[in-house]
Amino acid sequence: MQRFGTGSSRSWCGRAGTATIAAVLLASGALTGLPPAYAISPPTIDPGALPPDGPPGPLAPMKQNAYCTEVGVLPGTDFQLQPKYMEMLNLNEAWQFGRGDGVKVAVIDTGVTPHPRLPRLIPGGDYVMAGGDGLSDCDAHGTLVASMIAAVPANGAVPLPSVPRRPVTIPTTETPPPPQTVTLSPVPPQTVTVIPAPPPEEGVPPGAPVPGPEPPPAPGPQPPAVDRGGGTVTVPSYSGGRKIAPIDNPRNPHPSAPSPALGPPPDAFSGIAPGVEIISIRQSSQAFGLKDPYTGDEDPQTAQKIDNVETMARAIVHAANMGASVINISDVMCMSARNVIDQRALGAAVHYAAVDKDAVIVAAAGDGSKKDCKQNPIFDPLQPDDPRAWNAVTTVVTPSWFHDYVLTVGAVDANGQPLSKMSIAGPWVSISAPGTDVVGLSPRDDGLINAIDGPDNSLLVPAGTSFSAAIVSGVAALVRAKFPELSAYQIINRLIHTARPPARGVDNQVGYGVVDPVAALTWDVPKGPAEPPKQLSAPLVVPQPPAPRDMVPIWVAAGGLAGALLIGGAVFGTATLMRRSRKQQ
């Protein structure tokens, strides 16, 4: 028995020692090849951090560092064919129930350039350049987003009104060319020398007319010279993985003047909710940066992110105060889960807009082509207690991760398949929408575009969650117009409960499914709670406790009672002793 006990003790000690060594190795990182996991929790809200709503403007002086983005049209494009995403969403049937009339949609993006097919465009302010009104789009992004939400159709019969459009700006780092001085010299006198005509050639009789030059060709239309244009087309998106195809299309260098028409040529493009008003707020631009980026203790990139978070918070508050009932944020920010910057102001802003101002906030899930936007895990079957994989998040997307107050949109193709390499997954993704085959209004003229200029004479095709969010914002506006009695949170509830769900019911790529405008407008869906669950980080303000009760009378009474008991006990004890003493005598 003793030997058996000793062996068992040694075996237990050996197992304990092995476990200890393994724990030390894991803690020290000696076992490599394990993916990093940053356990994060859903963000909380501090309402006291709400930023003020003053006149829009940048936090620090800004300047333009790059040329504005030019736009184009892919070869072989026929705008008379309806974009695939419009056919997928069955918008013609959805429009039987309304077009979003009376709803204000704020577009917090790179600005929106005025266009004849955006007749209800409202300037909302500029957080990029001081004194701006939000109606300049150097990046050719915000105009695309706004047009997918609210562009009116063109039937070719009604002329569209002309709108003023500002000229494209140029980088402020360039110095203007030096003034040129032109000196005119007098023309020297010319000497004319007359040369006698040569004698007639042999064989020509004297007095016969000398043959002149050949007559010019008869007047009339001539076939124009053909210029074969060359270049390349980049297919998937603005940046990231690219598939480049050559362009070889004949161009006429002398096109004939177009015949006058009543209106622009008809096309099949329209915004999701062509009856809404658009509030344009320019909050970001890749062409602009801080005039002096090397001030303060932070590195320039971190400082820019901090400023972007602050201006986004202020833009959300400003949009809500301007009466927007839908707020679209397609230009989101990504950051590592290891280094999440302070977002108390942004959290307070989305809470204020969604709860206090009853606005539906729609945000993009983020695109893998953008800086710091690394893909998150989708699902870990070994963690059944964490079905949305919060503990596996490596990239935080803001303001998208404020999922209780923001409807975050992932991207799918025209067949409903997730764009897994482009759309950033996350536990905050609630719904999805098409993000390909993008068509929109041009920020440079009165036409349509489906591409932007890229490097090396290439065209980049817009795609991604930015445009998926625009589609959902348009559908949210349709639902708000159809059900004005519903709160913002109830509108979100209706959208996600009428979406076309994935196989698991909900996942981190498409959320609860692909948005379905017709179902959202027609299905019988319970309203649900009017407000989202509260996730407050600041302590609640509780009423002051009542004044403490005056205990002096109680203690006096208790002391008197105790004294009486003592006296009574003494008297009783004395009487008992006297009785015993008498008995003994």
From Swiss-Prot:
This is Mycosin-5. The lineage of its organism: Bacteria, Bacillati, Actinomycetota, Actinomycetes, Mycobacteriales. Residues 83-521 form the Peptidase S8 domain. Belongs to the peptidase S8 family. Residues 163-173 have a biased composition (Low complexity). Residues 163-269 are annotated as: Disordered. Residues 1-39 form the signal peptide. GO terms for molecular function: serine-type endopeptidase activity. It comes from Mycobacterium tuberculosis (strain ATCC 25618 / H37Rv). Keywords: Cell membrane, Hydrolase, Membrane, Protease, Serine protease, Signal, Transmembrane, Transmembrane helix.
